[in-house]
Amino acid sequence: MELKKGGIKEYLIMFFLLGVSGIPYFSSNQPFIILFALGLIGLFMLSSFSKIDEELLFVLIAILACVFFQAVTFSYFKGITILGLILRITTAYFAIKLLGEYFISYFLRVMIFLTIVSLIIFIPIFIKPDFLNTLIDLTPSFLSYQYELWGFQVDRKTMVIYNLLQEENRVRNNGPFWEPGAFGGYLVIAYIFNTIREKKLLGKINILFIIAIISTQSTTAYLALFAFIVCYIFFEDYSYAVKSLIIVFGVAGYVAFQTIPFLGDKIREENKGAKDAIEEVGGDTRMASAILDWDDIKGYPFSGRGLWPETRVDKKFEYVIRNNGFTNFIATWGILFFFFYFYWYYKGFSEFCRIYGASYYIPIVMLLIIWLLSFSENYFDSSFFWAFVFIGIPLKNVFYDEEIEDNNNLS
């Protein structure tokens, strides 16, 4: 794989951005998160950039306005939470400024590396599941992280570039991320960007991503990948014969959904068990989380209820888990900020699609797919996903030509 643009610094920026967003060894390490943000600020100050973009100011003003209104409404405010949010936002912004129009290229290259590593480790585990226990035993204790689950502290070991996560009934590829569904989501996003860039659904890089997506056994990732492929074929310049295959894909997808246990059965069980999940563990499924979030949304649909558990969660659900990122985001920030946030996503995606000549419907498809992915993961509060708010800044003055394509070459 040729690295024709940039050097080790740029790849480390992207890797650590993914790290603080979803790789537990980094995302659970508060001192590292702060040092990484300060490092980006320092690099920015040493660079040739002369000003802060107005987009960052718009976002910060909107955030502070929402927080002020919520603090007054609920008579509650915790400054450290807001400082953490601002840190994540500025981390995203400075990463975008330093990586520029090649942000997506660096993302794809790092994801290719992480995907290959994940498959090298996962395949032996899949063949012989006990190999995972061997890796855990061999991993030194300092390569570990802690998180809270239902009020209890949980310790996990990690190889950093592969998270040693154990599940009872299935062997799934979670890559370096906090769980397989999260890895699946990042892989689908990488697949989407690479498809638009290469203008083909089944290039060698995309085949690699598809294999890894299959290995995650993530229902949501499967549905998102299938939905994007169908939409891409429909909206791009494919023949009527190819577009007619959408019907075949649709029938095949429906059959798979009905017959493969971890697809249809998993979702049906979650729907049926949503009420019990709420009562027993405070919403530890996407449907139970959506129901709880909907109760919050109905009370404050426009302003949201804020980042603080004290303004969101009934005491009976003190250790509630809200893992439906879509409804959780609306419940937290309200409908008005929801549209503000994703307006910037749409602008950035539109610029990316313009550069590579994609249909003007594709940015909408990208947005819908990301919403679908978020139904099972809380993505939007992380620095990597905040970066999509600012992705249009370096892209708006870029025009497609052969020189850009050569510099952006992944092969």
Feature-to-residue mapping (PLM):
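Alpha-helical transmembrane segments of multi-pass inner-membrane proteins
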Residues: 108-131, 151-217, 222-234
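Transmembrane alpha-helices of multi-pass inner-membrane enzymes
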Residues: 38-41, 363-371, 379-411
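Helix-loop-helix junctions and helix-breaking kinks within/between transmembrane helices
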Residues: 24-35, 70-87, 175-185, 203-233, ...
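Hydrophobic transmembrane alpha-helices and their immediate junctions
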Residues: 199-205, 209, 226-230, 234, ...
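A membrane-periplasm/extracellular boundary helix in multi-pass inner-membrane enzymes
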Residues: 71-75, 120-129, 236-276
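Interfacial loop-to-transmembrane-helix boundary motif in multi-pass membrane proteins
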Residues: 58-63, 95-146, 365
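N-terminal hydrophobic segments of proteins, predominantly signal-anchor/transmembrane helices
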Residues: 11-24, 38-96, 116-121, 368-372
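Long extracytoplasmic/lumenal interhelical loops at the membrane interface
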Residues: 262-333
